[in-house]
Amino acid sequence: MTTTLSPAAEPRLRSAYEGQKSRPYDPAAPIATPLELHRCIVQPEWVDYNGHMSESCYLLVFGDSSDAFFRYFGIDDDYREAGCSIYSAETHIRHLREAMLGEPLRLTVRLLDLDDRRLHVFHSMHHATTGAQLATGEQLLTHVDMRAKRSAPFPDAIRRHLDAIHAEHARAPREPHAGRAIAIRRAVPAVSTASATSTSR
């Protein structure tokens, strides 16, 4: 089946944070671990034929959380208009519990690592009322010069803010599920004492 473009469709996907200016960096301001920068409600168009939020919409919500984070450390519409942005290079989502229509979501984000042009971030999605963890989203993000079509180092001012965030976030214990590969994990059969003794003779 081939889908066609709806005449009423938006010309492109829009972020929840478009049009909002980035926050000026204040070295004296406290940095929370994790940062809580985005909240939303599960929308009707996010719900699939199983009656819960579709898997693609988890990435949509994590993307909005990333956009809120970008704005926090200095990347906004003006920055992108000047020719640079951040692109996703890799994403790993863990779906832990269902998110249902109308439920409130609370997102947190931690900066796990960085270098001169890449960020390793870890998002966590929670039910805003019960606090239950619904999903996690781990991303490798790359700073890009959109005119040159290649990765580029962060400007010094943004790098200083990112270094401050990373220094604070590195104080907390590492996220236990960060960096894990997808696999079917099977239980290893236990070896009985009798078998082990017999084999060793």
Model region roles, listed by residue range:
Residues 2-89, 144-201:
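Hot-dog-fold acyl-thioester-processing enzymes
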Residues 40, 118-120, 138:
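Short, small/polar residue-rich loop motifs at catalytic or cofactor-binding pockets
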Residues 44, 123-125, 141:
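Generic short beta-strand
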Residues 62, 123, 137:
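Conserved GNAT-family N-acetyltransferase fold
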Residues 69-119, 134, 201:
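Hydrophobic beta-strand-centered segment that forms part of the acyl-chain substrate-binding groove
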Residues 96, 126-128, 144:
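A generic structural motif
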Residues 135-137, 153:
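A structural microfeature
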